């Protein structure tokens, strides 16, 4: 009701904050007091509802909510066939009396009738039957005749993306593939590529790196950004060592590379592949403010600065990479690794011989490796 403020009962508050529950006696007290103080409020919501029953003519057209029955009309003369009352539309007009019922209808208008001393109101359908021909006038529209020259709606058939008829791998006469799953399985290429470290490996490297530097996550974001820019310029070869640097305004900060390389698994370049998109966007941003080409591209002598965004060695090629960019990146990679010689085995540190020498020599022997030759001396 208007003018009444919202109210929360004490029992509701106890149930909300204490969970004590509500008893029927408490609700009954509130209801009695409510009826006593606001009788008009209760009366407005105690409305009586009446339902009217009747027989619906399923063949009636042109109206809604018609009451009564409509028997078929036969014979000659004008004879209405609707009991009850209603309004409708039709052609012509007619009057009739059947069994003490009076009915008057017009082409477009309303009609009223009485049956057994009871009157009703509503909307219905007027029907006028004249002569043996039995002309029927209805308020609704007639069904459209079927035109032999018309054509139906033609739809283009949709082919299935994967047919059941294709040959699939089977195990014990059962398919081993789930076709419905394949239709919705569209992972990112980078997430399942074996050239990029898994998320678990990256998390392990990140935690070990942070632990070695003894910094928090907020400081790590700054350090990781500086490391990415340093790798754009200097590459991410696993053979690099020493320190890496980043600038703090005009001051140069030096960080050791040992924890960066040692904790990278499988390789440092596979770790850095996670930074590929960010590095590409950074190079593009630098080129929007100044001419910028990473050192990796300067060594390859690239003259087209539009390819600068691909000129770093941990760039990750995808299906969206343009063909010209892929060719340029592969040529740069081929030039970078040209002349490199990777040995599977290095020099074995165990160079001592394990063979035991059992030869016995004396001072009279000719040499260390030769026995006496009957007094012959060997001079060097």
Swiss-Prot record:
Its EC number is 2.7.7.48. One of its GO terms (molecular function) is RNA-directed RNA polymerase activity. The keyword Transferase applies. Keywords: Capsid protein, Nucleotidyltransferase, RNA-directed RNA polymerase, Transferase, Virion. Residues 67-84, 129-140 have a biased composition (Low complexity). Residues 54-154, 349-380 are annotated as: Disordered. It catalyses: RNA(n) + a ribonucleoside 5'-triphosphate = RNA(n+1) + diphosphate. Residues 85-99, 106-123 have a biased composition (Gly residues). Belongs to the potyviridae genome polyprotein family. This is Genome polyprotein.
């Amino acid at each position: 009701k208007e003018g009444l403020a919202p109210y929360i009962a004490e029992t509701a508050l106890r149930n909300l904050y204490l969970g004590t529950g509500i008893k029927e006696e408490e609700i009954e007290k509130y209801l009695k007091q409510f009826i006593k103080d606001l009788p008009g409020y209760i009366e407005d919501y105690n409305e009586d509802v009446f339902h009217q029953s009747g027989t619906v003519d399923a063949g009636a057209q042109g109206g809604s909510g018609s009451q009564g029955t409509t028997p078929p009309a036969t014979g000659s003369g004008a004879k209405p066939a609707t009991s009850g009352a209603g309004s409708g539309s039709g052609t012509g007009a007619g009057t009739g009396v059947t069994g003490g019922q009076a009915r008057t209808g017009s082409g477009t208008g309303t009609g009223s009738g009485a049956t057994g001393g009871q009157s009703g109101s509503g909307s219905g359908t007027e029907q006028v039957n004249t002569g043996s021909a039995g002309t029927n006038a209805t308020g609704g529209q007639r069904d459209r005749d079927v035109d032999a020259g018309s054509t139906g709606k033609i739809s283009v058939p949709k082919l299935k993306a994967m047919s059941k008829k294709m040959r699939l791998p089977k195990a014990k006469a059962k398919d081993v593939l789930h076709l419905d799953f394949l239709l919705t399985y569209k992972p990112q290429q980078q997430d399942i590529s074996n050239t990029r470290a898994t998320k678990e490996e990256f998390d392990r490297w990140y935690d070990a790196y942070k632990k070695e530097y003894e910094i928090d996550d907020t400081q790590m974001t700054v350090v990781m950004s500086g490391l990415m820019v340093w790798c754009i310029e200097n590459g991410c070869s696993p053979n690099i060592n020493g320190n890496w640097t980043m600038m703090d305004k005009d001051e140069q900060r030096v960080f050791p590379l040992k924890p960066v390389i040692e904790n990278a698994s499988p390789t440092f370049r596979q770790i850095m592949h996670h930074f590929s998109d960010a590095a590409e966007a950074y190079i593009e941003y630098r080129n929007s403010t100044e001419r910028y080409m990473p050192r990796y591209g300067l060594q390859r002598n690239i003259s087209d600065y539009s390819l600068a965004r691909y000129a770093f060695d941990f760039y990750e090629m995808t299906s969206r990479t343009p063909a010209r960019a892929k060719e340029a990146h592969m040529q740069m990679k081929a030039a970078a690794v040209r002349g490199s010689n990777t040995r599977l085995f290095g020099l074995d540190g165990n160079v001592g011989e394990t063979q035991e020498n059992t030869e016995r020599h004396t001072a009279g022997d000719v040499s260390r490796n030769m026995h006496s030759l009957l007094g012959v001396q060997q001079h060097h």
